A protein has these predicted regions:
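Long amphipathic alpha-helical scaffold segments
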Residues: 20-68
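Acidic, small-residue rich beta-repeat scaffolds with periodic aromatic anchors
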Residues: 1-31, 114-187
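Beta-propeller fold detector
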Residues: 103-108, 155-159
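Cysteine-rich, disulfide-bonded extracellular modules and peptides in secreted proteins
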Residues: 88-90, 106-110
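Structural core positions within WD40/WD-like beta-propeller blades
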Residues: 75-78, 132
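Eukaryotic scaffold repeat domains enriched in small/polar residues
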Residues: 67-72, 81-83, 120, 136-140
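Solvent-exposed strand-loop boundary residues in beta-sheet-rich modules
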Residues: 98-100, 137
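Structural motif
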Residues: 85-93, 139-145
Length: 187
């Protein structure tokens, strides 16, 4: 077990810079790796390399979800998962067929917990006029008009009533605000 002293806890609670907090989390993980490696075969160096990659990437957790070429509209779309400590975003980027950037924007934002987003974002379907994101049971969740995307307009409609409850809005904005501890929470 990794011990965290009262002094470390107090120091953590006073941190306002997110990089300081990230480094605190990493320090705990790294202590845990080294402790576990005393009795188990743990690839500590590999974990440390992953931490460094995360640091080098600006502490961002982003990964490609899907990409699709839509020849009839002359575009390619990329959907990426973007997870921060404050929110999960589904980012849609549109390029022309040669890869020239057209526009990018978030089409879904929710709580930073995979319980909220993982089941809602599973498949990408293209119909004659729409780009649709479905959930794990193929129920439509979000829809974008292909004509909008081809014109560089990034917007979506949430098609699922339950999913809409977890998108920031006037009814839940205080819940989202409670998650922030950085300089944004003091404005």
């Amino acid at each position: 077990m990794v011990h965290v002293s009262d002094e470390e806890i107090q120091s953590y609670l006073s941190m306002r810079d997110e990089r300081d907090r990230f480094e605190f989390y990493f320090s705990l993980l790294e202590r845990g790796y080294r402790f576990a490696a005393q009795t188990h075969d743990i690839p500590v160096d590999e974990f440390l390399k992953l931490h460094q990659q995360f640091r080098d990437g600006g502490y961002k957790n982003e990964r490609l979800f899907k990409k699709k070429m839509i020849r009839d509209y002359g575009i390619k779309v990329l959907l990426e998962h973007v997870l921060t400590q404050y929110a999960y975003h589904l980012r849609l980027t549109v390029t022309d067929l040669k890869g020239k950037y057209i526009n990018s924007g978030y089409i879904y934002t929710t709580y930073p917990d995979d319980i909220f987003f993982n089941k809602n974002v599973r498949k990408l379907l293209v119909t004659d006029k729409t780009l649709m994101i479905t959930d794990f049971i193929d129920k439509p969740q979000f829809e974008c008009q292909l004509s909008d995307l081809a014109a560089g307009i990034i917007r979506s409609v949430c098609l699922d009533e339950n999913t809409r409850k977890y998108i920031p809005n006037d009814d839940n904005k205080e819940e989202f605000a409670k998650m922030r501890w950085d300089e944004e929470c003091n404005k």
